[in-house]
Design a protein with these regions (language model features):
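Pocket-lining segment of extracytoplasmic ligand-binding domains
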Residues: 179-248, 254
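Beta-alpha junction/loop-to-helix N-cap segments that form part of ligand/metal-binding clefts
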Residues: 75-135, 229-244, 248
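Hydrophobic alpha-helical segments within soluble ligand-binding/sensing domains
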Residues: 128-167, 269-288
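Flexible loop/hinge segments that line or gate small-molecule binding clefts
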Residues: 110, 117-153, 250-264
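An alpha-beta-alpha
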Residues: 57, 145-192, 294-310
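Extracytoplasmic "Venus flytrap"
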Residues: 36-58, 64, 74-83, 177, ...
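Short, low-complexity disordered leader/linker segments with a strong preference
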Residues: 1-37
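Flexible loop/turn connectors
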Residues: 257-308
Length: 333
């Protein structure tokens, strides 16, 4: 009899314990379901390419269910001011966001310097290793992962030679302050010089010197190439104005800049880069550790043409190039 009572007592206690565990799990799941996820986004500067990345990030989060009252997104823009990057990075960290996202290299660097605990998601960084954000793209060792959009340089040089076969000297316009630009410049020089092109670098410290530098360049080069460079992108209208006056084609690395007056690019869609960045963030938000989320490397692109610019510069687009290209701007009829 005593043994039966003991058994029933143990069964009763087990039921109570399991019930308590189940209740706790239900409460936790309920709390997780109702938790407001906090996402901090730091954008380096305002220009169309980065704006498209930011839009892609927000839309990508929405598609993953992070929308409405389920998410609080704080977007800060440093407008190219390095001191603001430091201040804003600390603000997003102090706000205890679940993840922080840096759009452009300086923004990602600022966030990575501000925290070693909160996951930092890179928003389309061309050279994360060179920028000292990660050491290993496949196995991020710290709290930083995200997307890396590596410019398809070899394809770009081939496009330059196809569209402007008589161009012998290519001028590269970039900002000396941007680490991400320097690696692209070195890569472009390697492929271009291998193909017999003469490459001349024109580095500017800020947007203030672009107009003067363009005046010098246009008398010495046959075509201009700009890397993924936020300083140049934010003053691209100045570049195009000077190039148009001199009747010199400008090759870019971004689809939005072809729409703004560049002749052509082997482009990566900036909006889709933003959505890829969101996918990396979602993996971390759903519980994956940063070290288990490899950097998403996007290194291909699609030839993108501005046929109106080609028309204005009397450049004939070969049929084989035309067939495989996206058209950003049509020619006048």
């Amino acid at each position: 009899m005593k043994n039966k009572r003991l058994i029933w007592t143990l069964v009763f206690l087990a039921i109570l314990t399991l019930g308590s565990i189940g209740t706790d799990l239900f409460k936790k799941e309920h709390q997780d379901a109702n938790k407001v996820v906090k996402v901090g986004i730091l954008q380096f500067v305002t220009h169309d390419a980065l704006d498209q990345i930011e839009k892609g990030i927000e839309d990508g989060l929405k598609e993953a269910g992070y929308k409405g009252d389920k998410v609080k997104i704080t977007l800060l823009n440093a407008e190219g001011d390095q001191s603001k990057i430091q201040t804003m990075s600390k603000q997003l960290v102090n706000d205890k966001n679940d993840v922080v996202i840096g759009i452009a290299t300086p923004a990602a660097q600022g966030l990575a310097a501000a925290t070693k605990d909160i996951p930092v998601i890179m928003g389309a960084i061309s050279d994360p290793v060179g920028a000292k954000l990660v050491k290993d793209l496949k196995h991020p060792e710290g709290n930083v992962t995200g997307t890396s959009n590596q410019v398809p340089i070899k394809q770009t040089v081939e496009l330059v030679k196809s569209l402007t076969p008589n161009a012998k000297t290519i001028g590269i316009l970039y900002a000396s302050s941007e680490d991400n630009s320097k690696s692209q410049v070195e890569s472009f020089k390697k492929y271009a010089e291998k193909d017999g092109l003469n490459v001349v670098e024109y580095a500017v410290p800020s947007t203030n010197e672009i107009n003067t530098t363009m005046s010098v360049m246009t008398g010495k080069v046959d075509a201009i190439w700009t890397p993924q460079d936020n300083t140049i992108a934010s003053a691209f209208s100045t570049v195009i104005s000077s190039a148009n006056q001199a009747k010199i084609p400008v090759y870019t690395t971004v689809d939005t800049m072809v729409k703004e007056g560049g002749l052509a690019s082997v482009a990566q869609n900036q909006y889709e880069l933003g959505k890829a960045t969101a996918r990396s963030a979602v993996k971390v938000l759903k519980g994956k550790k940063v070290k288990d989320v490899p950097v998403d490397v996007i290194d291909d692109g699609t030839p993108t043409l501005n046929l109106k610019v080609a028309q204005d510069l009397n450049i004939t687009i070969p049929d084989d190039v035309l067939k495989q290209s996206d058209i950003a701007v049509k020619a006048d009829k």
